[in-house]
Every structure is written in structure tokens, then in C-alpha cells.
Amino acid sequence: MKKILFIGLLSLGTSWAQPKERKLVWQEEFDGVTLNEKDWNFELGDGCPNICGWGNNEKQIYTKDNHSFKNGNLVINVLKNGNDNYTSTRITTAGKKEFQYGRMEVRAKIPTGKGIWPAFWMLGSNIKKVGWPKCGEIDILEYVGREPHKIFTSLHTQDSHGNTINTKKTQIDNIEEGFHLYAIDWTKDKIEFFVDNQSVYTFNPDKKDENVWPFNQPFYFIINVAVGGNFGGHDIDTGIFPQEFLIDYIRVYQ
């Protein structure tokens, strides 16, 4: 998730085709009625006492109650409960499903409105040992309602002191309409980001030491919706709630 942001607009680039040698190795279709806790963990509360506001001055409290399943989708329900009190859900695959290299993709429909901040992202599995940002972070999808029609794709590393300098924001006029496919193609040399199979950003540094390239280890998935915060924006439109983040599926090819 973001702290300081240096950005550039990027037009959609080349399209993507799955290499023939890759196979589907894991999928989460969200076709059940409960979350599969063999693969998923809940992260609860407001981040306190260690990282209050989840490190970004976010307003929401995460609960197990703010999710449901509808028409084969996971639904994260973002609610306003009284004055300046918001609830949401955050889930991870830490310690259960972790992956190194391949194509990771999610099909999702984002919530909208000023103050909303949905994300599908990954953290290095060694985070408890080395901390953030040395563990590395891959933001496959981030959207903030204060900047409509734009998607953010980013990386965080020790070299950037956690700041989001390895990033692009891409204008997609219909991104708030219906479902879209967000993906990365991750190899030992590069990470390329895609929206609806169109390339939007590639990170391929010449230097690949542990501070620049912590992406040579397994990472785990995180799905959440934050409210407000340093990146989501402190000017929250209280009239937009409730909001829903719909996730159809996640698939990993290697």
C-alpha cells in the first residue's frame, strides 16, 4: 500500500498471451458459501498496537463479518457505522498459499467513490524476518476513488525506502464499469503488469541486489478495501456507503 507516490500516466501497451509451457497451479473461484480457511487468513482490527491505521492513517476496522458470497463472487462489504466509523474485510494467504514467479491474475469489480481504496497485492513471505519494505511488495491492483478512471500498479522495495517510485497509473475510462482482469507476469528478470491483458508497466532493473529486487522469493496474496488514509485520501464522501468489492476469481499459472 502507498506512502509517497511519484507517478506518470501511461497509455495501454502490448497485449499478452499465455506461454504454452505454463499450467494452472492454483485457483480460487469463490464458488462456496464460506471462506476456505485452509488457504486464507483474516487480518482483523485497526492495525494497533504495532501499525495503527495500518501504517497509512486508514479509517477502517477489519472484521470477519464484512464479507459474503454472491453469484460465485467474494464480496467485501464496506460499511459506515456511525460517525467516522468504517468496517471492511482484509484476507491473506500468508503461510498457506505463497508463490514465486508465474502469472497471477484476479478478475474483479471495484468499488467507487471518494475515500475508497480497494487493493489486490502481494507481500514477501519473509516479512516477519526482515520487515517491510525489505520483504518487497507487489501492488497488482490499486484504485482510489479520489482519482476516477485510473488504476495504480506499483512495487515497493528497500531501495526506494518503501516509497512508491516504481509505479504507473493508467487511465482507463470504463474501469469502474463491470469486471476487469488485473495481472502480473513475474519472472526472475522482470515483473510486467497488465489490465485486461494489455501491458501497462514493466519493472526490469539492471541491478538486482536484495534492496532493488526482493522478488526472488515466494510472495502471498492480500485482498482488502481501505477507507481514507494517506493514499485513499482524507476527504471521504460519507454518502457513498455501503460499497462492494467483488472478486470473481484468482488464478496462478507457472
Residue ranges and their predicted role:
Residues 1-20:
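Bacterial Sec-dependent N-terminal signal peptides
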